[in-house]
Regions:
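Catalytic machinery of carbohydrate-active enzymes
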Residues: 1-314
Length: 314
């Protein structure tokens, strides 16, 4: 069987999304290997697939030449630029890049995403074009065993962090939102990673369960009713499991592309476009967007999501 490699960006969400490509490669007759920084965590979710941590840049040419086809998610990292260079010099000719945004490095055979569609849908269309497989967003994520889908329908998971602090809504607003939701009869649980836990443990009155692995987080999400959070990987995981999501962000343009794209979801963004004055280093959209997304705005978006979710159940 022909062998293929997928080179992912660093986020958990990127890994889940690129598994769409892995499924298409299987349909096209390839045996895929997925390169990702969180290879060990993702392998617990996709037990029948092969994950390998990214190799040192100096080893890329030797390692990737062992594969018949290589699909790369462009993240403008040092690794991606090294691969651009190797391809332009004819050292790695079998590379195909997925470009979320336009780039001078696009070559014939690469795929530029449509910014009006989700990444999940873009990847399914890219694979149809590149591999000739039917367009589908399925990534073969196995559902948790011995768990009940949406068992706790009124349980809301709030994921208040991300891998970029500038993407995070204000902590005090997450807490205010939680109190408001609890008054409406919902059970609210906060979910944070080990590195963020110390900032949240001392807050009185919140539920903050401890999880031993991404697999345990997945199982907990699967039995919950909703997930609310920033633009982060857990939103993609919830959507992948069929759990409705509400994503809070200051960048509507980015979110049109990167919002969770497997099941129903809503977004909460500022009520009007925010500028970035780069010349005077006043990046309002980047650094101050949180001030323009109120608790009431997010709460209303959640009520709309909950109502839509109810309609989908019948």
């Amino acid at each position: 069987m022909k062998k293929a490699a997928l080179c992912c960006a660093s986020g958990i969400g990127d890994g889940l999304l690129m598994m769409i490509g892995a499924r298409h490669l299987k349909l096209a007759g390839y045996l895929p290997t997925i390169f990702h920084d969180a290879a060990e965590e993702l392998s617990l979710l996709f037990e029948s697939d092969t994950f390998i941590p990214h190799v040192p840049i100096e080893d890329l040419e030797n390692i990737l030449n062992r594969y018949d086809r290589v699909l790369v998610e462009n993240d403008n990292s040092e690794r991606a630029w090294h691969l651009f260079n190797l391809r332009s010099r004819g050292r790695l000719k079998h590379l195909t890049f997925f470009f979320p945004t336009d780039s001078k490095n696009i070559r014939e055979g690469d795929f530029l995403f449509n910014p009006k569609l989700t990444v999940a849908l873009n990847l399914s269309l890219a694979c149809r074009k590149i591999l000739g497989t039917p367009a589908t967003k399925e990534n073969d994520l196995p559902l948790p065993k011995d768990k009940t889908f949406k068992k706790y329908l009124k349980r809301i998971i709030i994921h208040p962090t991300s891998n970029d602090a500038k993407r995070n809504w204000k902590r005090k607003r997450f807490l205010s939102l939680a109190r408001r939701l609890e008054k409406e009869g919902f059970s609210v649980v906060f979910c944070v990673g080990p590195s963020d836990r110390s900032r949240w443990e001392g807050i009185e009155g919140i539920s903050l369960p401890r999880f031993g692995s991404l697999k345990e987080v997945e199982e907990y999400i699967y039995e919950s009713g909703f997930l609310i959070g920033n633009d982060s990987g857990l939103g993609h995981l919830a959507s992948n499991l069929g759990i409705p999501t509400l994503t809070i962000s200051g960048n509507p343009k980015r979110l049109r592309l990167w919002r969770p794209g497997w099941t129903i979801g809503k977004v909460a963004t500022p009520p009007f476009p925010l500028p970035n004055f780069k010349g005077i280093n006043l990046r309002i959209r980047e650094n101050f967007w949180q001030n323009f997304v109120s608790v009431s705005r997010v709460y209303q978006a959640f009520i709309e999501l909950a109502n839509e979710s109810c309609r989908h159940m019948f």
